[in-house]
Design a protein with these regions (language model features):
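Transmembrane beta-strands of outer-membrane beta-barrel pores
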Residues: 25-31, 69-77, 164-172, 206-210, ...
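Residues that define the transmembrane beta-barrel architecture of outer-membrane proteins
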Residues: 17, 41-47, 135-142, 156, ...
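Extracellular loop and loop/strand-boundary signature of outer-membrane beta-barrel proteins
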Residues: 33-38, 128-133, 171-177, 211-218
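Gram-negative (and chloroplast) outer-membrane scaffold detector with strong preference
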Residues: 42-171
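Transmembrane beta-strands of outer-membrane beta-barrel proteins
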Residues: 19-23, 61-69, 158-164, 183-187, ...
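Short loop/turn motifs that connect adjacent beta-strands in outer-membrane beta-barrel proteins
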Residues: 8-19, 54-65, 151-158, 194-200, ...
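Outer-membrane beta-barrel "beta-signal"
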Residues: 193, 220-236
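Flexible, surface-exposed loop regions and adjacent strand-edge segments
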Residues: 37-43, 78-91, 176-182, 217-223
Length: 236
């Protein structure tokens, strides 16, 4: 009877927590056309702070407001580091067509030809690219967010989060001619484990970054993101 009473008190405490303060890190190992973004092969790391506050809840279900800021936001974009033709063209080139510049960040890091050169005899030779990566640093804020948690009186809880914010970078993202200010939204499921006044949450999110056609070009970036959050829970 005494143990049941202790468990009941602990369950009510988990369901009754009002707010939390946390630190998080996320990693997107790749990007592709998942839903609406086109830019490929981006890697993004973030780290920051999260705040959440209960909006509504009972022993079974809970709705929280959540907001976050990521002072560390690093994106690695595929970049042309060299180009080469399939055969030697020394002294034979009469014109060059549609080759990317060395150091240019590209939307698609393709194994297909990136251009061609015309030879004096009228034939053409296709040119391929060698890719490296370029780092761009940014600040991300997501002031509008919500998280639904199931089994809110239990230690292990399924969650679903959705966040909306912006990214402010030191140069255009993901390529030149886009924009240095981009909109950001993400959503996806997760699992949260609560132990006393602490919690750990692991999520897998779909995230999209876009300038909403405010730049000359808007390829957009779609990523699958792993996010890990460590939180301190408070009842006031």
């Amino acid at each position: 009877m005494y143990l049941l009473r202790i468990r009941s008190i602990a369950s009510r405490a988990r369901a009754g927590r009002r707010q939390s303060f946390g630190v998080f890190s996320s990693f997107a190992p790749n990007s592709s056309h998942i839903l609406i973004g086109d830019a490929e092969k981006r890697r993004v790391w973030t780290a920051g702070l999260e705040y959440s506050h209960r909006l509504w809840g009972n022993d079974s279900l809970r709705l929280d407001y959540e907001g976050s800021v990521s002072p560390f936001f690093q994106e690695r974009d595929p970049t042309v580091v060299a180009t080469y033709p399939t055969v030697s063209t020394v002294g034979l080139i009469s014109y060059v067509e549609a080759l990317p510049s060395i150091g240019e960040r590209v939307v698609y890091a393709t194994n297909n030809p990136v251009g061609y050169v015309g030879l004096g005899d009228g034939s053409i030779v296709y040119v391929y690219a060698v890719y490296g990566s370029t780092k761009t640093y940014a600040l991300a804020i997501s002031p509008l967010g919500a998280r639904v948690s199931g089994f809110s009186s239990h230690r292990l809880q399924p969650t679903f989060s959705a966040d909306l914010g912006m990214v402010f970078s030191s140069r255009d993202l993901p390529v030149d001619g886009t924009a240095s200010s981009n909109f950001l939204f993400s959503f996806g499921p997760g699992m949260q484990l609560i132990q006393g006044s602490s919690a750990i949450r692991l999520e897998y999110l779909y995230r999209h970054m876009s300038n909403a056609n405010s730049g000359d070009y808007n390829p957009g970036v779609d990523s699958g993101v792993f996010r890990l959050t460590l939180s301190r829970l408070r009842t006031r």
